[in-house]
């Protein structure tokens, strides 16, 4: 039934043709069940395991690798001779990588869909209904409830469907609907129509929503919506419809994959076409097909070389290390890619209660009457320190501490707060914090009494558990609570009837009252001044109400409670307590004692975090279910708004936002910093608008109502104290529910991205080198310098370890002084592309050069000519060009070993270059990242392992090297450091803002030797120089290769 909240009880009952006392007939139930179905959320049909596995192979890079593995497998099948076994290693390793990636992908997908299933926990199992087949109430399965059913609910029940209340059988009905609306306190319900058809859920006071809990009272109502038509069902539909966005990093890697696949395809085809003339060479037995297959194998090797197989594993490892660091800061990351996304967050949409605030209601101001003369009066105003439930703080007047027992009015005020109260403080030993037992408002009053200590109770030596209620206990020993007149909506107050524990002539029964100021003060005839009682005059009343209005609408927007007493109440037997309508009669002729103002105070550290966000170019938006006045007041206190800033067009309620045109709503999301009284649909809409501006949005939430927006935003952040639905729909969980933790996580995300850029570029330059190597050997007609199994080893193991260690690079000191990076910013800019292409070309040329050196110039090598090397495929006994050359020498493992050793060593030097994007190694020596030094040592150890430990040399088709050969490897490898240092110098001094270095030779003073050598690590210089001198002073016939 649409808009049931706007209809009268009679209209709703008439719509379903049902009587409240008898309920539906079985015939009606049957028809309604056929029409509306079961009252349950349908199980989401997830993807089958096979569909999930196939999905993992939709990535272009993965498909290319899979194709390369299949082709390698087919070619290995037809391989002959000694290479038969080793030929199968390559396809096997590639398939192993793909299977591992698929397992991780499937596991992540399965986790993502758990959020929808978690909604099931809010479905009640049973419900109590009236139906015509029985005279009394009956318990049935909640899934069998249909629209039109008359349902009975009582304290402790979970509401089984969306219900329009028809009658309340207790004084009040309180409902905890925080999981759905985000309201921090339970809500009082009534049965009157709410005429506004566009009312938000918070304002539908005559409705009960499926999945919410009854906190107090008993009532009956008629079911108006079941299953997917309930409010919680609508949330489920939103979550099903929400497609998970790919993170900026995933998008960048997708783009990189597409570009790389095109480049790979072109190079592979080019290599194959270049060598068409060699298809008929004698080495292939004169068979054109065998020649074509041989060069096809080289093209496959090229594809394997070009794909950074280790990249997924390194990224996963780096992100996992980041999550560990974040966990230490109370940010528990559920989705690994979101770690990097945090780094480009440009908007944080934060809930108010418990995130920006403590969610611990606290009394911060109070007043009592000081003097009254006719229509004029003066007040004693006090402020109270402490913003949590901890009974620690002091009462101050004019910023100076006061002793509360010196003011008679404060003693009576504390007595009312302690006795007109059903809540208490409790010390949780496991968490080490004080917690509320009962309502937040009443717990704030309990805490106030502890801070006031009006009877000077000795508190030293008490345990924290004893301290929790020490002062309240003293007051409760003086007076005994006989009965309570519960809160009701019409009078907006509650009271307790108390008698003294030790009766005497002077002490007598009293009624203590607390409630909304306007309701209580209207029923006050007198005011308490010290220990005397003075008549309330219109002027005094106006003064009191003006102060209360100022507190309620000023910068604090306090929630005010008036406290009063009835000095001569009726005796219990003279009261008729069965009917709550009589309560107001007994709460008249009251004496006003004082007023307290409370709020959910901001967390102490939030203001500095909001300031840090502003420095980092991140906009903070508060989105709350609370009212607008309170929300704006908190925004001012924490710095989202300035103290006197005009909030017109910067703060909206959900209703005001709905009334805007779509274009105005879009503009509102661009400028606003506060949204109050919002519903789940508003949060999702705000996220959509922000995403349309290319903003990267982090959204916080804790209730079921927040789940769709959490899932839709780039970073969903759930509270540690939130619901399972919110947690499973989110990417990150805040263990301490603290906004400052989000800011710390953003800082960590930025550092992780910077490090990730370094190792991605490091791996890419390595792959460029491998591609250049294979391309050069094919273009020059040289024998194979590297084979696929060696390339896999380098890409996965020897490169993988330093790349992972680069994730430990220290973050920049000014990382939070820069604006968020543009998520569309490429991983590799034009300059960086040139830089890594240049390095890659050197890596490729050096690798081929190392193999050529062995053939042409090495002692113990064949010393063939360049022509013979580049035409080795024409080598046979009757060819005069190869006279005296043993053709078997072109299949020697030595040149391949030289090429592999140079590739590995050069990559270790490249890892050192990647310590910083533009900072020189002379100023940032290797031990700045000790993990990198360790990983380089381990990678070189693994390289020695495959060189010197049998049977590994056979598998990798390599052989041990002697000292001269190793010196040659170092000679060829070390120049890559000098080359990158030159490129860094250019970037530092001509492409970025000039730093401290000597870059402006206009004045000689700025180019002094001391200025240019400032910050150089001399220990590193003294360590490296002797090594370089020794390497390059040793003769290895290097020059002979060029003379040849």
UniProtKB/Swiss-Prot annotation:
Gene Ontology biological-process annotations: autophagosome assembly; autophagosome membrane docking; calcium ion import into sarcoplasmic reticulum; calcium ion transmembrane transport; calcium ion transport from cytosol to endoplasmic reticulum; cardiac muscle hypertrophy in response to stress; cellular response to oxidative stress; ER-nucleus signaling pathway
Binding site for Ca(2+) 1: 304-305, 307, 309, 795, 799
Keyword Ion transport: yes
Pfam families: Cation_ATPase, Cation_ATPase_C, Cation_ATPase_N, E1-E2_ATPase, Hydrolase
Region spans: Interaction with TMEM64 and PDIA3: 788-1044
Cellular localization per UniProt: Endoplasmic reticulum membrane; Sarcoplasmic reticulum membrane
Function: This magnesium-dependent enzyme catalyzes the hydrolysis of ATP coupled with the translocation of calcium from the cytosol to the sarcoplasmic reticulum lumen. Involved in autophagy in response to starvation. Upon interaction with VMP1 and activation, controls ER-isolation membrane contacts for autophagosome formation. Also modulates ER contacts with lipid droplets, mitochondria and endosomes. In coordination with FLVCR2 mediates heme-stimulated switching from mitochondrial ATP synthesis to thermogenesis.
UniProt similarity note: Belongs to the cation transport ATPase (P-type) (TC 3.A.3) family. Type IIA subfamily.
Residues annotated for ATP binding in this entry: 353, 442, 489, 514, 559, 624-626, 677, 683, 705
Keywords: ATP-binding, Calcium, Calcium transport, Disulfide bond, Endoplasmic reticulum, Ion transport, Magnesium, Membrane, Metal-binding, Nitration, Nucleotide-binding, Phosphoprotein, Sarcoplasmic reticulum, Translocase, Transmembrane, Transmembrane helix, Transport
Cofactor names: Mg(2+)
Species: Mus musculus (Mouse)
Binding site for Mg(2+): 351, 353, 702
GO CC aspect terms: endoplasmic reticulum; endoplasmic reticulum membrane; membrane; ribbon synapse; sarcoplasmic reticulum; sarcoplasmic reticulum membrane
3'-nitrotyrosine, modified sites: 294-295
Reactions listed under catalytic activity: Ca(2+)(in) + ATP + H2O = Ca(2+)(out) + ADP + phosphate + H(+)
Positions of region (Interaction with PLN): 787-807, 931-942
Record protein name field: Sarcoplasmic/endoplasmic reticulum calcium ATPase 2
Segments on the Lumenal side according to the record's topology features: 70-89, 274-295, 777-786, 851-896, 949-963
Upper taxonomic lineage: Eukaryota, Metazoa, Chordata, Craniata, Vertebrata
